[in-house]
Amino acid sequence: TLKNGGLVAVDMTNGTKKWTYPTTKGDAYFPIADKNGNVYFTEKGSQTVHAVNASGSKIWEKNVGNNLNYSGGALSTDGILYIGTQSNNKVLGLDITNGNIVFEETVGQQVMAAVSIGPDRRLYCGTIGSNNIGSIKAFAVNKTLATDSWSIRGGDIQGTNRQK
């Protein structure tokens, strides 16, 4: 049993619990697995990104100094985990081998939904600003915001990827 929250791995062949990984503050948000079975996730109510291996053992934990509520990750083919932050309005890129921050960009509003990587290698993130007006922002994955980046305004997209 996970008293405070955490991550549970389930055997997909029979539905039994394989392992658990407890967290200290809250639920595991938006777990994403790489080709080796390593799992990366954020934790509700914390500033920590976790990486665990396919057996449920810790690889690394990284305090990114920003609130990660509602933030999920996108894993690039070059081994970067992109996540959005609620505080400080940033998208961060973490090296999946060690958790070091290798990309950091301020997007101007709270990131309130998982970051996605499109087939065009752009990052897409849902943000929310004043009066709960949401936006979707897109920018190139070239370590800086591209001049041809764009943004679209919509409704309240807190915790979702929906567009009104």
Language-model segments: which ranges?
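Extracytoplasmic/lumenal domain signature
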Residues: 1-164
